[in-house]
Amino acid sequence: MKYKIIKTNDQIQASVIEMARRINKDYRNKEIYLINLNDSAKYLIQDLKKVLKPKTKIIKFKYENYKVNSNSNELRILKDINYTLYNKEVIIADGIIISGNTHNYITKYLKLRMPKSISMICIGIKKNFLEKKIPKCYSLFSFNNEWIEGYGFGSQKTKNKRNLFDLRK
């Protein structure tokens, strides 16, 4: 099956450079603790690291989503952070933000460690679907109803491709 390319790697790279410009300005002379959620932003982080100026420590954080039939938005943490985040500049990295429920939960969880600040980066955000407030977010793109995969996240067919695809039929 052929999927529709909605963002080419060239378009993605241009947006990564723009994102880096904004982060470089906002975090000038600061160290960033960049937390990669479930490796869903691995390509974004790889490309961003090439143009980020602040010293950056990349940390993996793994979790399991809450159960579909449950009323709880709790996450099960599979790999926690082994660094102190006290008074640190924290940026959470993820693929696509849809409802914001997961990011709201993780932000509250990380705030218990008293970082100086928490913001986010993502490949895309679906602002029309946000249910929860999230921290300041640097996003490559905004999406509506597209089913986005590629550029490091999604199914095995598209995950390792450098473009973004819309999988809607």
Describe the residue ranges of each PLM region.
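PRPP-associated nucleotide enzymes
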Residues: 1-169
